[in-house]
Amino acid sequence: MFRLEDFNFHNKTVFLRVDLNSPMKDGKIISDARFKAVLPTIRYLIESGAKVVIGTHQGKPYSEDYTTTEEHARVLSELLDQHVEYIEDIFGRYAREKIKELKSGEVAILENLRFSAEEVKNKPIEECEKTFLVKKLSKVIDYVVNDAFATAHRSQPSLVGFARIKPMIMGFLMEKEIEALMRAYYSKDSPKIYVLGGAKVEDSLKVVENVLRRERADLVLTGGLVANVFTLAKGFDLGRKNVEFMKKKGLLDYVKHAEEILDEFYPYIRTPVDFAVDYKGERVEIDLLSENRGLLHQYQIMDIGKRTAEKYREILMKARIIVANGPMGVFEREEFAIGTVEVFKAIADSPAFSVLGGGHSIASIQKYGITGITHISTGGGAMLSFFAGEELPVLRALQISYEKFKEVVK
């Protein structure tokens, strides 16, 4: 795949696809983490004398965060300490004229790419390159730099459509993400421990099945709703209250798949030995084999128990490779953050090479000041897709573009 260092960008127009999709409140961005992650790439392009045209999406149609990129231009201007022009258009004549007016070292950001209906659906490269977004923008750009790892699992025009039309190059963040994930996945070091929590049960089951079948993991530790599904699949009773909650969330549909995975890999999948429930606003620990397990019928599971967290810590401290995605419980409430904090601290304290991803995972380590994890991935869904053994469309597009243009570039 092409790297930034392979090209001379002086006076060239570069379409830089990033993922600046950020949480917002009252029209203001409340976390600039994704902005800071791509600053090295933007600064490199500016210093190389490129004319930088940034493209990002923000929110999903009809969601609260679905808005223009005017605020993104303001945040970028502050972080870069230079003006970033907001172009209130994507690929129309106005946008193309504004792009042509850019001078070496200047930066502009296009309107929210999802304002274009073409950008909302996933389609093969062959269809994406026929879109107006790709056809119109390709007339006014020289190169495409992709630094949007968080959306690498999507196949949309701005992400993959330019692959056979313009040289498509990895940004620094994309390169860093790929290197870290490849190292974690393919490393011969052992033990390799996967820690899967949170609510993305379907994706997590795919990861468990793939890494155990391909012998990419020695052990999988579970937390969050992922653990609840596996615990039910093992035949434990989580109580009426919790089963009803899982049914409402559609999670009981995954129990059969979890049972099939356990039939093949039971010794390699660890589930909690105890849980913490919300007992009238307080944390109460319940051992799965104790007499008070009847409380599970009335009170909701909010976290893994302390004994489970201690057992997980012992395992993690001996690991050489750790991959983690998703919290152990409802970390937003301090009394139920114990499992998440203890497990993530263990990952940070472990001598292992560690990779952690997922929006809630990152939010939890920031909230509780946990440092020491080797690589924090910006991609939750993309990271899970990678470890599930699925082909990431953006990586495929980068490879296709390299094969198409490698001789031309030389």
Curated annotation (Swiss-Prot):
Keywords carried by this UniProt record: ATP-binding, Cytoplasm, Glycolysis, Kinase, Nucleotide-binding, Transferase
Pfam families found in the cross-reference section: PGK
Top enzyme category: transferase
Localization per record: Cytoplasm
Transmembrane segments: none
Example of a GO MF term: phosphoglycerate kinase activity
Binding site for ATP: 332, 358-361
GO cellular component: cytosol
EC numbers, comma separated: 2.7.2.3
Positions bound to substrate: 19-21, 34, 57-60, 114, 154
Location (main, coarse): cytoplasm
Keyword Manganese in annotation: no
GO biological process: gluconeogenesis; glycolytic process
Pathway: Carbohydrate degradation; glycolysis; pyruvate from D-glyceraldehyde 3-phosphate: step 2/5
Domain of life: Archaea
Catalysed reactions listed for this entry: (2R)-3-phosphoglycerate + ATP = (2R)-3-phospho-glyceroyl phosphate + ADP
UniProt subunit comment: Homodimer.
Membership in a protein family: Belongs to the phosphoglycerate kinase family.
PANTHER family: PHOSPHOGLYCERATE KINASE, PHOSPHOGLYCERATE KINASE 1, CHLOROPLASTIC-RELATED
Protein known as: Phosphoglycerate kinase
